[in-house]
Amino acid sequence: MKFSEMPYKRIDMEEVEKEYKSIIERTKNAKSGEEQFEIHREYYKFTADVQTSMELAMIRHDIDTTDEFYEKESDFYDEVGPIISQYENEYGKVLYDSPYRDYLESKIGKVTFKNIEIANKAFDEKIIPLMQEENALSSRYSKLIATAKIPFEGEVYNLSLMKKFQTSPDRELRRKAWKAVSDYFLSVTDEIDEIYDKMVKNRTEQARQLGYENYVELGYYRMNRNCYDKEMVENFRKQVKEYFVPFANKLHE
C-alpha cells in the first residue's frame, strides 16, 4: 500500500484515555510476569495504532502545510500529544516498579527500563500546558519555513527548491540565490524572533519546573540519550578539537 493510500482517522481521545486506564489498571493487578507481558503486548499494539494516526496526520501536514484539514489535525495532536505522554509515563512507572521486573527484563530487555527512567525525568503532569504551547510554537515555525515563497529568476520557489541555486557552480547565480533567501528571512525576522524568544522562555520554564537549572539537561532526556550524557559529549568535542582538527589540517596541507 502506498503512503497516500493509507487510511486516516483521528483518534478518539475518550476511547484512548479509557484504553490507557484499562491497561494501566490491569498491569497493576497482574498476578505474574507472564500476565504483565501479555498486557504489554496489547499495549504495543494499541500505542502503535495511536502513533500511526498521529504520524499520518503530521506527515501529511508537513507535505502540504496549506491543507486546512491536516492543519487542524496537526493542531489537535499538538494539544493531545502531551496528554498521551502523561498516560505513557504513568504506564511506564507501573512497569518500572513491577514486582516481576526480572521476568519483564528477560522479555523486553533492560534498555526499555532505562528509557522509562529517562522519560520519567523529562515529564510531569504540571508541565502539560507548557508542552502544548511548545508544540504550537514549533508548528508555527515549521509552517513559516514550509510556506516560504521566494521570487527568483522570474519564478517562485520554496526554500528546498532554492538549494539547487545556492549550490550552483555559477558563482553569480549562487550569490543571487543566497540574497533572495536572505531577503525572505529578513521579511519574517520579527516573527522568527518572537517564536524563538517564546520557545526559549517556555523550555527554560519547563526545565525549572522539573528541577533543572536550564533546558540542556532536560533536552538530553527529551532526546532519549540512554548511553551518553552532556559531559561525555563535551569530552568528545574536546577530543575533536585537540586531535581530529589538527589531523584534518595536515591532510589539507
PLM region descriptions:
Residues M1-E253:
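A well-structured
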